[in-house]
Structure formats: C-alpha cells, structure tokens
Amino acid sequence: MALYSIESEQCLGMSHSGAVTVNGESAVELSDEEVDILVRLIKEKDSTDVKELDLENFHPDIYKKLDEAYYQMAYDAEEIHWLWEGYYNGCFEYDDDGLMAYCEKELGFSFEFKPEEYFDEDDLEYYKEDPESYEDEIYDVKCEAFHEWLSDYVSGLSDDEARDFFYNHMDADLNLDDVEYTVEIPQTIIAKAQQ
C-alpha cells in the first residue's frame, strides 16, 4: 500500500470580486495491484477519464477508494472555507462568557484591569457611588480585550486547528449536503502510465 497525492479546485459561486474557488489537497491509499490495474487501463483505453475507464462497473473497489478520497477532500476544502467565512462575518452564536472562561483557563488569555488607564478622577468618584455600573464597565473593557486577543489567537491557527476550535468552542453549525466534486486518477499514476 502507498499514498498517492490528489488535488482539487472547486468553484463555489461568484462574488462581487469574481469566482470563489477553494483548493483541496489530500491522498488516497492504493495497493500495488490497484495501481497496476489503473496503469494498464490508462494504457489500454488511452484515457485518464474515470468514466471512460468504467471503473465504477469493472473495478468498484478502486472506484470506491477514489470516490471517497475525492469527496472527503472536496468536503474538507469547502467546509473550512465556510467556517472561516462564518467566523469573519460573526455568524457563530457562542456563549461569550463561557468561551472567555475557557480561554482564560486553557489558552492563556489574561486580563488585568487598571482603572487609571480607562477612567479619570471624576469617573472614579462617580463609580464609588454606583459600584454596579463600575462592574459593568470593567466587564465591557474585559470583553473588548478578550475579542482582540481572540482575533489574534484564531488568526494563528491552522485550518485543522481552527475547524476544531470553531466546532468545539464557538458552536459553529455547518451542514454541507451537496458538495460538488469529480473523481480522478492521481497524477503520479497517470505519469506512471505515460512512461
């Protein structure tokens, strides 16, 4: 068994700036025997088109492996695109306090409130008489600091790390029912057949 690299490019539609495309990269595991079958078919039929090779009917096991690999690659590429879009457009409805507490405990977010940086003496006198408003102000300042920290933290994540973070801690909810993809022969195998 060996891993063969596969790639894809999908157009998700149009935006005001042109076509929105996503690229996927993955790998499919095939045995030497399966690779030999593909090489032989490509040479015999002088084609690399999966439909023309009729893999689905005559070699369903190979077709299934390729189909699953290309589908998963396309799904992953489209999924992470929409997750990032959802994050940047504020579409996730998560518990702000819960996320802030998690990030303080597990990820290093810390907040130290220094009244002199935010309030002058008159403000502080006012808040002495209204401690509840003072606590509200501190909370608002902390939330603002947290969102700045969160933006920096998330922008430093890889796609896989971001995917996990969005689902596990920001209540991302995404259902992709209709992922478009094509099943192809890995380029390395095509090159082998053309030698």
Listing of model-derived features with the role each one plays in the protein:
Residues 2-9:
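A short beta-strand micro-motif
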Residues 191-195:
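Short acidic DE-rich linear segments
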Residues 12-185:
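Acidic, low-complexity, intrinsically disordered interaction modules
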